[in-house]
Curated annotation (Swiss-Prot):
Name the record gives this protein: Transcription factor E
Keywords: DNA-binding, Transcription, Transcription regulation
Segments crossing the lipid bilayer: none
Gene Ontology terms describing biological process: regulation of DNA-templated transcription; transcription initiation at RNA polymerase II promoter
Length: 176
């Protein structure tokens, strides 16, 4: 997929936004062809140099940008020339979705395996053991805690897991 096509994809735009934040998004959304300095980017985009550097470093940490250093022979100053490498984004998104799938499966099991109690007044949720420790009273307000039904939450998680598996074409057995 070409740079332009990648950057038009709303999922990829959101991914980049999550990485670099709103101040770094102009840097991530307009990668120049070839090498560019952070100063050139800041001037071209009308951004603070620190915001550009922060975005570039985040992109670098996520293998979406590389740099090479040049030392000015007269002044000894280093110049960093940055290159964007967005070819890895689809693979990284897939890895992120697998992490999400794993985390959601763990959370679903936690929700299934535990009994919960809720203080209607404070909105605090307790596991059975915690509720029992407190004598089934909320430690914040003293009200009685009530059994909390989480079937809808588990069902919503199962639906989301199914959607993720479909998107990933994962061959994972759905537990009943």
């Amino acid at each position: 997929m070409a740079f332009e096509e990648l950057l038009e994809d709303p999922v990829i735009q959101k991914y980049l936004h999550e990485l670099v934040g709103p101040k770094g998004m102009p840097v991530a959304a307009a990668p120049p062809d070839g090498e560019v300095t952070d100063e050139e980017l800041a001037e071209e985009l009308g951004l603070e140099l620190n915001d550009v550097r922060r975005a570039l470093f985040i992109l670098y940490e996520n293998d979406l940008a590389t740099y090479r250093r040049l030392r000015d022979e007269d002044s000894g100053w280093l110049t960093y020339l940055w290159t964007f490498q967005y070819e890895k984004i689809p693979e990284q998104l897939q890895e992120e979705m697998h992490r999400l799938l794993d985390g959601l499966e763990e959370r679903r099991e936690y929700e299934r395996e535990n009994e919960f109690y809720l203080c209607e007044h404070c909105g605090i949720r307790f596991e059975f053991g915690e509720a029992m420790e407190f004598g089934f009273e909320c430690p914040e307000c003293g009200n009685q805690v009530e059994t909390m039904e989480n079937t809808r939450l588990v069902t919503a998680m199962e639906n989301r897991l199914e959607e993720l598996r479909d998107e990933l074409n994962a061959d994972v057995d759905v537990e009943a």
